[in-house]
Amino acid sequence: WEYEYMAFSRRVGELWEPFCKLCFIYPLTNIRLFVPPLFEEVKRNLANEISNYIDGLRIKTTEKVQLKKYYDKVWGLVTSGEIQLECDLHFTEGTNKYIVDFKSGFGSNEKGNTNRLLLVGSIYKNIEAENYKCLIFVRSTENNHYLTTLHNSGVWEISCGVGTYERIRDFTGYDIHDWITSNIDWMNDFSPHMRESILRN
């Protein structure tokens, strides 16, 4: 496989993510997968909540109408495109609902994805009827300022490298880091041609 660096990283991620997700599909614990809400549903519920709040204010009817117009303007800015609330994994543990995004690593072209994650995470955090927690599981320990931005946002909880495998073990009961260490030796498992290609790049 003559892969350039970013393409190879993506192929690794395509193998790594479903490998990790198997632990959540067949857990040794009591976690359960769930279907995430649709953005239109979240928007409708929040709009009704705000509308009811405005209706209860002791202000003139014309002022209530104006407030609702301003509120609609804000939604117009946010919803210029369809927002997908679906991430890579959604599961419950007790009363908590976890939203998980898997990343092989954070490279130089993650700005758009970072902005999307900040928006999606913020929406989940503002759904007060549910106790959502947003997690990012990163395979690599070498990442850049985009991941730091997500970490500093307070919206996403980040785990990298061995820390990711520890969280997976805590949630599912599987120690896949130990399994990887015991069963995979990439450089010796690859064909000589593949090994030379990796060392060359």
Predicted regions and their residues:
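Short, charged, amphipathic alpha-helix that recurs within catalytic cores of restriction-modification
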Residues: 113-126
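Domain-level recognition of nuclease-like catalytic cores that cleave nucleotide substrates
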Residues: 135-201
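Surface-exposed cleft-lining segments at the edges of enzyme active sites
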Residues: 5-9, 72-77, 101-109
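Conserved catalytic cores of phosphodiester-cleaving nucleases, focusing on short active-site segments
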Residues: 24, 87-105
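Nuclease catalytic cores
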Residues: 1-29, 35-37
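Active-site-adjacent loop/helix micro-motif of nuclease/hydrolase catalytic cores
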Residues: 106-116, 145-146
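Active-site metal-binding core of divalent-cation-utilizing nuclease and nuclease-like domains
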Residues: 36-93
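Hydrophobic beta-strand segments of well-ordered beta-sheets in folded domains
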Residues: 96-99, 130-138
